[in-house]
């Protein structure tokens, strides 16, 4: 059978289709199947590049819309702890609440966000960006490379904060007094 037969049997499919054929007469049928593109053989490299660019744009728009919807939901959110951060890794987009984050660590111009359930996300934002965003929600800078969710701290032990998940994070000498005040108050 043809590609059209296969698509007809599937009914719906979770992927995009680019038809490549030597026959112009199938173009209308390809349009009916909502093909991303219809390329005549021999396929020209620039035509294939354009089709792939169109695919990327279409999927970036979906991600962008999802992120924009979450942004608008955050603006209307009265409970700051219910606000969600949008984190994109590869082709997946995650939405996590600040309460889920145990701590953030700096890695050059990237930040690793660690969650209570053991997940780890790498973000292209700096730790300073996250500090600005999360400090009003109870996050505390304990070291130049570490930001901690105060609600996750169980105790201080020999220059370290210990979290509910047993993680031990160093507190810099410069930050010790500030950390003690923040935890006491």
Regions found by a protein language model. Name each.
Residues 1-71:
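CheY-like receiver
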Residues 8, 32, 131, 180-181:
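A cross-family signal for key residues in well-ordered alpha-helices
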Residues 12-13, 136, 185:
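Short, well-ordered coil loops that connect the C-terminus of an alpha-helix to the N-terminus
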Residues 53-170:
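Conserved binding/recognition cores within well-folded domains
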Residues 172-185:
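Short, basic/aromatic-enriched C-terminal tail that caps enzymatic domains
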């Amino acid at each position: 059978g043809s590609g059209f037969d296969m698509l007809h049997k599937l009914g719906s499919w979770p992927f995009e289709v680019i038809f490549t054929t030597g026959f112009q007469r199938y173009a209308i049928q390809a349009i009916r199947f909502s093909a991303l593109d219809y390329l005549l053989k021999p396929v020209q490299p620039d035509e294939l590049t354009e089709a792939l660019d169109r695919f990327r744009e279409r999927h970036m728009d979906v991600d962008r819309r999802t992120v924009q919807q979450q942004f608008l939901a955050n603006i209307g959110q009265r409970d700051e702890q219910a606000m969600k951060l949008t984190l994109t890794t590869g082709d997946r987009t995650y939405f996590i609440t600040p309460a889920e984050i145990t701590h953030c660590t700096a890695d050059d111009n990237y930040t690793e966000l660690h969650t209570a359930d053991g997940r780890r996300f790498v973000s292209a934002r700096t730790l300073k960006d996250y500090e600005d965003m999360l400090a009003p929600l109870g996050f505390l800078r304990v070291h130049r490379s570490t930001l901690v969710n105060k609600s996750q701290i169980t105790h201080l032990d020999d220059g370290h904060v210990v979290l509910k998940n047993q993680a031990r994070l160093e507190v810099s000498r410069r930050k010790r007094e500030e950390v003690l005040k923040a935890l006491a108050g």
